[in-house]
């Protein structure tokens, strides 16, 4: 009997998208349920932090997008997204991409606060961090031309697309090598079918 795998996700979480892309790329069959974490108190029994994504397999709960991606990769019959020969480089770049997602998300949350509550200095700090991180990826990343798929590629693509979704397109003209790779990668079916949206 096949395990029932449920991914609790949101319509525009870059972390959730990363896990959905991983499932599609690794051909792991999952059921995705889009939820509003502010209302979904039922998920507390699976994840007391009430964060998405959260993966539930029968009675097992897996939280944190990296853990979920590792699990999905481990049960796939496809080649791993975490090859041993450059495992730590992949993990480091994935963490950098996660940090980029977090900065874009924190900037977004600050910009939608009321005018008397929002901090322009905090917003500016996040914008500087976003631009610095993308430039670092442009100059430091070595997996542009791999002929095989790895986790850092998925994470970086999701982070860059989320930057476009929540911030701006400016990085594209200022990081041409990265943008050239991104424009090709974003055309893959698992990216086209997981675009973030407002619900």
Regions found by a protein language model. Give the residues of each.
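Non-transmembrane alpha-helical segments in soluble domains
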Residues: 69, 73, 91-94, 134, ...
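Short polybasic/polar patches that bind polyanions
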Residues: 24, 165, 187
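Conserved residues at the C-terminal ends of beta-strands
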Residues: 58, 157, 197
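Generic structural signal for secondary-structure transition and capping sites
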Residues: 77, 102, 142, 190-191
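Secondary-structure boundary motif
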Residues: 45, 74, 139-146, 187
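Charged phosphate-binding loop/patch that engages nucleotide di/tri-phosphates or the phosphate backbone
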Residues: 173-174, 179-199
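GST-like fold's C-terminal all-alpha helical module
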Residues: 97-183
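GST-like domain detector, emphasizing the conserved glutathione-binding G-site
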Residues: 1-121
């Amino acid at each position: 009997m096949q395990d029932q795998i449920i991914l609790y996700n949101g319509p525009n979480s870059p972390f959730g998208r990363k896990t959905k892309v991983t499932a599609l790329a690794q051909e792991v069959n999952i059921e995705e349920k889009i939820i509003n974490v502010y209302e979904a108190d039922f998920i507390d029994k699976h994840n007391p932090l009430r964060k998405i994504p959260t993966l539930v397999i029968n009675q097992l709960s897996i939280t944190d997008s990296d853990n979920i991606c590792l699990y999905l990769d481990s049960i796939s019959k496809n080649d791993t997204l975490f090859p041993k020969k450059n495992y730590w480089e992949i993990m480091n770049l994935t963490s950098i991409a996660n940090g980029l997602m977090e900065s874009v998300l924190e900037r977004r949350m600050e910009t939608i606060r009321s005018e008397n509550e929002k901090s322009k200095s905090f917003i500016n700090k996040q914008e500087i961090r976003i631009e610095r991180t993308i430039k670092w990826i442009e100059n430091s990343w070595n997996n542009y031309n791999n002929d095989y798929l790895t986790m850092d590629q998925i994470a970086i693509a999701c982070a860059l697309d989320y930057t476009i979704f929540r911030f701006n397109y400016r990085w594209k003209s200022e990081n041409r090598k990265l943008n050239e790779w991104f424009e090709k990668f974003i055309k893959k079916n698992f990216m086209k079918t997981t675009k973030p949206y407002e619900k």
